[in-house]
Swiss-Prot record:
Membrane spanning stretches: none
Subunit structure: Homodimer.
Name of the protein described by the UniProt record: 8-amino-7-oxononanoate synthase
SS bonds (residue pairs): none
Pathway: Cofactor biosynthesis; biotin biosynthesis
Protein EC: 2.3.1.47
Record keywords: Biotin biosynthesis, Pyridoxal phosphate, Transferase
Organism: Pseudomonas putida (strain ATCC 47054 / DSM 6125 / CFBP 8728 / NCIMB 11950 / KT2440)
Positions bound to pyridoxal 5'-phosphate: 106-107, 176, 204, 233
Pfam families registered for this protein in UniProt: Aminotran_1_2 (PF00155)
């Protein structure tokens, strides 16, 4: 029978890989209502606590009054409004680049940049643990596609030696399921030495890394010559929605001409851009948010290590607890939820087989007391997994 979807779904259920959407019935924040239950959440990417900030909300409301609620058309027709342009200028300033280009989603930004820059006769090389949108962009581009070993400049160099045509090296800045940082200085040196361009998706670094929140490129003290193509998202640390590509004048003009996900879609609501302008202002001005977040990360890592939990090498708000077995990861997530804590279990195919984990994410909106509540609950629940295996 064609399209036997029931069999595919049953197979996924049997492997403990079936996914369901929790229903959020409250604004984003540490304390949420999900499926009718009040919970303390550690699974949002609202890293700076701006998604429900009153000034950001007020900016959106004022933007709707001034500009309406719809983009109305694509950017190249009559959908590129003054707030969109102002956001692009603010993002160029934040990232220290000549220009930036606004996209509706991070997925579209990644697909648009890759497919506009490389095609048949070219080469795209990607880290094995890159986000799905980057991998999809590489496959859709029509270029020769290969993956190098995770965060391994030597592995990249060996593949660059076999590359043909224009060559684009693509990596996450912060790897979303592990929380570790790409070795950008080494990757940039390898790429530049072989005439390749380096593209970095800094979805999880923008706003949280760098003294000014400029992200992983600022964190490492690199520039546009080291990382010609920089991607960032606005739905995480910025607390709103959308994404951007930042780079040279020529890069942005090329994307306007050739990036199909940019050309053939309606622009985001101008009021959303007004909200993003305010969140970018808060990101720059309220440096205490990054400082407080860094303190929470230290607190969690020290406490988790004392409990004997297996963490990954992450200096970021993403703090995965590796469990291994998918069923056990789901069980620990359920045990925590019974105690009023929401921590999501991440399973294959999102992560490699045998590496299921609880993906703890911290926010500047959390308090030290809330992080301690999580550690106390883990101290109570984690040993129950070991007892079940005994």
């Amino acid at each position: 029978m064609a399209f036997d979807l029931a069999a595919r779904l049953a197979e996924r259920r049997a492997a403990d890989l079936y996914r369901q959407r929790p229903l959020l019935e409250s604004p984003q924040g540490p304390e949420v209502v999900v499926d009718g239950q009040r919970l303390l959440a550690f699974c949002s990417n609202d890293y700076l606590g701006l998604a429900n900030h009153p000034e950001v909300i007020a900016a959106w409301q004022a933007g709707a009054e001034r500009w309406g609620v719809g983009g109305g058309a694509s950017h190249l027709v009559v959908g590129h409004s003054t707030p969109h342009h102002q956001v692009e200028e603010a993002l160029a300033e934040l990232t220290g680049r000549p220009r930036a280009l606004l996209f509706s989603t991070g997925y579209m930004a990644n697909l648009g940049a890759i497919t506009a820059l490389v095609g048949q006769g070219d080469t795209v090389l990607q880290d094995r643990l890159n986000h799905a949108s980057l991998l999809d962009g590489g496959l859709l581009s029509g270029a020769r596609f290969n993956r190098y070993l995770h965060n391994d400049p030597a592995s990249l160099a060996s593949r660059l030696d076999k590359a043909v045509g224009n060559t684009l090296v693509v990596t996450d800045g912060v790897f979303s399921m592990d929380g570790d940082l790409a070795d950008l200085p080494a990757l940039a040196n390898v790429a530049r030495a072989r005439g390749a361009w380096l593209m970095v998706d800094d979805a999880h670094g923008l706003g949280t890394l760098g003294a000014k929140g400029g992200g992983i490129v600022e964190h490492f003290g690199l520039g546009v010559d080291d990382v010609p193509v920089l991607i960032g998202t606005l739905g995480k640390a910025c607390g709103t929605a959308g994404a951007f590509v930042a780079g040279s004048e020529a890069l942005i003009e090329a994307l306007v001409q050739f990036a199909r996900p940019y050309i053939y879609t309606t622009s985001q609501p101008p009021a959303l851009a007004c909200a993003t302008l305010k969140s970018l202002e808060l990101l720059r001005r309220e440096t205490w948010r990054r400082e407080h977040l860094a303190a929470l990360i230290r607190q969690f890592r020290e406490g988790a290590q004392q409990l004997g939990l297996q963490l990954m090498d992450s200096p970021t708000p993403i703090q995965p607890i590796v469990i291994g077995d998918s069923a056990q990861a789901l069980r620990l997530s359920r045990l925590l939820r019974e105690r009023g804590l929401l921590v999501t279990a991440i399973r294959p195919p999102t992560v490699p087989a045998g590496s299921a984990r609880l993906r703890v994410t911290l926010s500047a909106a959390h308090s030290e007391a809330q992080v301690q509540l999580l550690l106390n609950a883990l101290a109570e629940c984690y040993p129950q997994l070991e007892n079940a295996d005994a």
